[in-house]
Regions:
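N-terminal strand-loop element at the rim of the active site
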Residues: 7-13, 25-86, 159, 250-253
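A conserved mid-protein helix/loop that constitutes part of the nucleotide-sugar donor-binding site
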Residues: 17-18, 215, 222-238, 306
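Glycosyltransferase donor-sugar binding loop
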Residues: 39-43, 220, 243-258, 275
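A short helix/loop element that forms part of the nucleotide-sugar donor recognition site in Leloir-type
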Residues: 170, 196-210
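Nucleotide-activated donor-binding/catalytic signature segment of Leloir-type glycosyltransferases, i.e.
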Residues: 257-283
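Acidic donor-binding loop of glycosyltransferase active sites
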Residues: 284-301, 310-313
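Conserved acidic donor-binding segment of nucleotide-sugar-dependent glycosyltransferases
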Residues: 329-341, 348-355
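A charged, aromatic-enriched C-terminal amphipathic alpha-helix characteristic of glycosyltransferases
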Residues: 355-381
């Protein structure tokens, strides 16, 4: 099958780009021909508070990536639609994660359909359809996009219900396995297995400049208000023996977090790496950590959980969105309320009762259900 995958990809950075590149490899391994149609311009400056949208990593091998789309240029949308249609794909898979992309992607897909042979199927791999940080007009933009698609694959059941809401038609939601083909299908986010093998813990900590042998929890990824770093910092006041490694570029005003750090005298127990983490360094952070903490205030699915699964690190996640679907409470980690005391209790239990060895075994045992083969199969049903 010849597949057009419309998604950010190298040299653009971030979780969507990285996972789409890995998906393209999985599709190719399944015998399909894949072209990734990426963006010449993805975000305007007002939507991207980070330092750069571009990765310094080497381009992935064996992938055909075409930088084509411009999110702000309607003329480009029509041209892009014609270019993709001219390649005569048998299937189109499109990533959707932000309502801002609705006009661009919705228009491109309508042009692709109009210029293609009848029967072309367009499947949206939908990370989010209602964003974590809401803006006026989100619903209209997402609805415009959604009506350009034939079906949807979600990696969190909460997103399925959001699609139901956006389309205004409850009968569209079909999450059961009985249906061979359904408007909305579910497959959990696969494990990120493209970050190399785990390192020995002491070596990883040394490489990161961490000399302390204390229990170490990891908060990893871009720092935004909904990800709840403030909850973790508040929780650390109850666990004076635990250190925290904070790794990721801050998209918020750091002053609010610094105030909590100073209020609870946390500086000596924090290891701050407040920058975007390149691909080749990811293994250092997960190898150094005893426990990954995701204190999110709202979420759908999370790629961070799947990196933790790859490196065999247990997790503390909060009872929001699709996170409880990914972590088995008391086995591969803890599922707790998004409150400092609950997060602190989970961390305390893990270290006080020496749960590392057993929980790491559970994490390794659970990895099998998060396969790329399963996602490919679900997308192409």
């Amino acid at each position: 099958v010849k597949i057009a995958l419309i998604s950010p990809a190298h040299p653009l950075r971030g979780g969507i780009a990285a996972s789409s590149e890995r998906l393209a490899i999985a599709l190719q391994e399944a015998g399909h021909i894949v072209t990734i149609y990426s963006f010449k311009l993805q975000y305007p400056a007002f939507l991207f508070p980070g330092k750069t949208q571009y990765s310094e990593d080497a381009a992935p091998l064996r992938l055909h990536i075409v930088p084509l789309l411009h999110s702000l240029n309607p003329l480009n949308w029509f041209i892009s639609g014609r270019v993709i249609a001219k390649s005569r794909p048998d299937r189109v898979i499109v990533r959707f994660w932000l309502p801002f992309m609705g006009p661009c992607l919705g228009t491109v897909l309508r042009i692709v359909r109009r210029k293609s042979a009848p029967g072309l199927r367009i499947t949206a791999l939908t990370d989010n359809i209602i964003p974590h940080e809401k803006r006026p007009g989100d619903l209209l933009l997402s609805r415009y996009f959604a009506h350009s698609c034939d079906d949807f694959v979600v990696m969190s059941r909460s997103v399925a219900h959001e699609i139901e809401y956006v389309l205004g038609a409850p009968t569209l939601v079909r999450l059961t396995k009985q249906s061979a083909i359904a408007p909305i299908r579910y497959a959990p986010h696969p494990v990120y297995d493209n970050y190399g093998s785990a390192m020995e813990k002491t070596a990883a900590r040394t490489a990161l400049g961490i000399t302390a042998k204390a229990p170490l929890v990891l908060f990893f990824g871009l720092i935004r208000a909904y990800k709840g770093l403030d909850l973790l910092l508040e929780a650390l006041q109850y666990t004076p023996h635990i250190h925290a490694l904070i790794a990721g570029e801050c998209y918020d005003d750091w002053a609010a977090y610094q105030k909590i750090i100073e209020q609870h005298h946390l500086s000596e127990r924090l290891h701050l790496h407040l920058h975007f983490i390149p691909t080749e360094q990811v293994k250092l952070y997960f190898s150094a950590a005893d426990l990954v903490v995701q204190p999110y205030k709202n979420a759908t699915q999370s790629g961070i959980s799947q990196i933790a699964y790859h490196f065999g690190v247990p997790m503390v996640v909060t009872k929001v969105g699709g996170l409880p679907e990914i972590v088995a409470h008391g086995a591969s980690g803890y599922v707790v309320a998004p409150e400092p005391a609950a997060i602190a209790d989970a961390m305390q239990d893990y270290f006080t009762h020496h749960r590392s060895e057993w929980m790491r075994e559970q994490v390794r045992a659970a990895r099998g259900r998060f396969s790329w083969e399963n996602l490919v199969k679900t997308l192409l049903k």
